[in-house]
Amino acid sequence: MSANHTRMIDLSKFAEAKNAALLTFCSVWMGAIITLLRSPDELPLGFDYAFKASLTVLFIAAIISLKSLMPKFLNQVHKREDEYKNLLYFGDIDQIGTGAYPGMAADLYTPTEGASATPTYLHDLAVQTAIHAKIAHRKFRLFNWAGSLVLFAFGIMMVPPILFCIRWAVNRLHC
């Protein structure tokens, strides 16, 4: 169970790294597009319209990527029916405080002789594993949305050269 918990944390970290990279990618492209749009020279082939539309789509993708990096707290992903404190969750540890935490952890998590773990520890670990799985799933889902928007933005930027090629080919056929 501990290995599975570690795996869920690793998946969350991986998804977060992907979203951070996508946010950086969007930021660089938005900066480049803004630089091109601010140029005093007119952009060829209608790129100004494509860049303006792409800029909007990239901005939305960047917002989604940024949203995925925002932390989720236990009460946002797991509804409790009592005042139980999960001593594996940083928010509960913070509420308990430094003075009380070591004693509570020892009372709840020290196994009896012959046992490798307490039922309370296994329960808390299972809850944390499930929560990290939800968080990782959310981060990957948001990455897919943002990544799809980035691909859509690139599709928009491809419209002017594709139209140019089509016009060029049609003009060659009429010769």
Swiss-Prot record:
GO BP terms, alphabetized: defense response to virus
Membrane topology: Multi-pass membrane protein
Compartment annotation: Cell inner membrane
Positions of transmembrane segments: 17-37, 44-64, 146-166
GO CC terms, sorted: plasma membrane
Keywords: Antiviral defense, Cell inner membrane, Cell membrane, Membrane, Nucleotide-binding, Transmembrane, Transmembrane helix
Presence of keyword Ribosomal protein: no
Function recorded in the entry: Pycsar (pyrimidine cyclase system for antiphage resistance) provides immunity against bacteriophage. The pyrimidine cyclase (PycC) synthesizes cyclic nucleotides in response to infection; these serve as specific second messenger signals. The signals activate the nearby effector, leading to bacterial cell death and abortive phage infection. A clade A Pycsar system.
Name of the protein described by the UniProt record: Pycsar effector protein RsPycTM
Protein species of origin: Rhizobium sp. (strain PP-F2F-G36)
Species classification: Bacteria, Pseudomonadati, Pseudomonadota, Alphaproteobacteria, Hyphomicrobiales
